[in-house]
């Protein structure tokens, strides 16, 4: 309201001081634009000063000349000169865009001769041009000509039979590799089934503790006895194992017996015995053989005792290393 009152007061003062009174339309225009903002009020006051400066001649001037006088008085002569000296200001460097025509359709506007090219009418595809132009046929091996076929046939005829026999073997190997895929899946199916049964806990679990060898036997369809029904190796089996080792030790003993004994010199040539201590005699071969047998019998028993305390491995490294 304060700005409106100030605009009305300014318009009244301008009318009172002017050479000619403002009509009703000019007064409303001045009041409206002066009430918009302080900058607009300042512009309207400057225009009134210019009009007062020219006096009664202002009304006789054409509107274009009035606008030119207002621009020259408000802006000043320096601003157009500075703009002219700047020359052609080029567009700043920005990201390059596609400047060519992208559309394939001409749009006509009604009956008038107005046409423009629709930039959104190009064919759309999720693939790029290089992907659409790519084809496997360009990478395929071209078929050899008849001359090359005949030369290959001649070279094969000259080649030895060994090389000809190796080619069917390679083809059979490739066919076996191709057939390995479904067979591998059929082998893995019972394995995962058994593994799922092992993961079940409680009395419902059928396979509470299985070793990798038992899993393999179950995959083959064989029945596996629980750990409680498995028999421990008897003492006869333990005695049967070191027999080959004992046979290996016997030739060494016989070789020692075959070594020729040194010929004893006559007693007259031997020096007199001194009271020094006699060297220790090696034990007879029979006693040494018994000790070796005891050591051989004791080693498997210790190995079995130590293996019973070790937890069985599952065969999966990522589970055993936890």
Swiss-Prot record:
Residue list for modification Phosphoserine: 37, 130, 176
Highest taxon above the source species: Eukaryota
Residue numbers bearing the N-acetylalanine modification: 2
Biased composition (Basic and acidic residues): 183-203
Principal cellular location given in the protein's record: cytoplasm
Segments of skewed composition (Polar residues): 142-153, 161-177, 245-255
Gene Ontology, cellular component aspect: cytosol
Keyword field contains Acetylation: yes
Keywords, comma-separated and alphabetical: Acetylation, Cytoplasm, Phosphoprotein
Pfam families cross-referenced by the UniProt entry: DUF4706
Compositionally biased tracts (Low complexity): 1-17
Subcellular location: Cytoplasm
Region span, Disordered: 1-22, 81-104, 142-301
InterPro entries: DUF4706
Entries under PANTHER family matching the protein: SIMILAR TO RIKEN CDNA 2310022B05
Protein name: Uncharacterized protein C1orf198 homolog
Highest classification ranks of the organism: Eukaryota, Metazoa, Chordata, Craniata, Vertebrata
């Amino acid at each position: 309201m304060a700005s409106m009152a100030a605009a009305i007061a300014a318009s009244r003062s301008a009318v009172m001081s002017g050479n000619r009174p403002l009509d009703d339309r000019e007064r409303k225009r001045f009041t409206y634009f002066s009430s918009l903002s302080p900058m607009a009020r300042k512009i309207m006051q400057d225009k009134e000063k210019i009009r007062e400066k020219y006096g009664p001649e202002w009304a006789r001037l054409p509107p274009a000349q009035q606008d030119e006088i207002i621009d020259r008085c408000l802006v000043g002569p320096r601003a157009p000169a500075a703009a002219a000296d700047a020359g052609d200001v080029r567009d700043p460097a920005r990201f390059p865009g596609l400047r060519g025509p992208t559309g394939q359709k001409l749009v006509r506007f009604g009956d008038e001769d107005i046409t423009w090219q629709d930039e959104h009418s190009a064919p759309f595809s999720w693939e790029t041009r290089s992907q659409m132009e790519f084809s496997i046929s360009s990478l395929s091996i071209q078929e050899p000509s008849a001359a090359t076929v005949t030369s290959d046939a001649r070279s094969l005829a000259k080649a030895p039979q060994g090389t000809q026999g190796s080619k069917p073997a390679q083809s059979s190997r490739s066919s076996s590799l191709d057939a390995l895929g479904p067979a591998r899946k059929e082998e893995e199916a019972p394995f995962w089934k058994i593994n799922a049964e092992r993961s079940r806990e409680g009395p419902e679990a059928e396979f509470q503790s299985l070793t990798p060898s038992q899993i393999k036997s179950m995959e083959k369809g064989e029945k596996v006895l629980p750990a409680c029904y498995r028999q421990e190796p008897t003492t006869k089996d333990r005695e049967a194992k070191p027999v080959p080792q004992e046979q290996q030790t016997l030739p060494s003993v016989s070789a020692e017996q075959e070594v020729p004994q040194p010929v004893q010199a006559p007693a007259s040539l031997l020096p007199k015995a001194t009271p020094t201590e006699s060297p220790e005699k090696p034990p007879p071969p029979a006693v040494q053989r018994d000790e070796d047998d005891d050591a051989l019998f004791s080693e498997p028993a210790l190995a079995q005792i130590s293996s019973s305390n070790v937890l069985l491995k599952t065969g999966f490294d990522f589970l055993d290393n936890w």
